């Protein structure tokens, strides 16, 4: 009986270890090419931007668009909200509007690698 419990414990431990090792590979905690960005804690548009990020991750493009627009209204210089709005607009095939937002994000945060090195932003700005 003791040997069965030890075997089960070993299998469970290996399973947990495998899941933990795979976490970084599957995007857990890493940014993909079109990941929405959280805003800095000091931003007046933080709540709406971060709410928009949640909806964006769920594929609710139109709902996230509304939150990103509110965030920009609260803080017009919030580069992350402009970038995120560009992502949402791109998903809804509103490419001209998306390009405008990506350009604004790049203008506001020229040294932010999450924005300036974004493949989707580069694709739009090259259009």
Regions found by a protein language model. Give the residues of each.
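Register position in tetratricopeptide repeats
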Residues: 57-58, 91-92, 124-127
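Conserved structural position within tetratricopeptide repeats
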Residues: 70-73, 106-107
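Canonical tetratricopeptide repeat
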Residues: 50, 84, 118-119
């Amino acid at each position: 009986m003791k040997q069965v419990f030890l075997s089960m414990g070993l299998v469970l431990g290996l399973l947990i270890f495998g899941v933990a090792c795979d976490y970084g590979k599957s995007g857990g905690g890493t940014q993909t090419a079109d990941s929405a960005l959280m805003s800095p804690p000091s931003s007046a548009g933080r709540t709406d931007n971060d709410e928009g990020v949640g909806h964006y991750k769920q594929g609710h493009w139109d709902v996230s668009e509304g939150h990103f627009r509110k965030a920009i209204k609260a803080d017009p210089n919030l580069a992350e909200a402009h970038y995120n709005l560009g992502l949402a607009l791109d998903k809804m095939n509103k490419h001209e509007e998306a390009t405008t937002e990506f350009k604004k994000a790049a203008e506001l945060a020229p040294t932010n690698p999450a924005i300036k090195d974004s493949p989707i932003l580069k694709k739009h700005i090259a259009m």
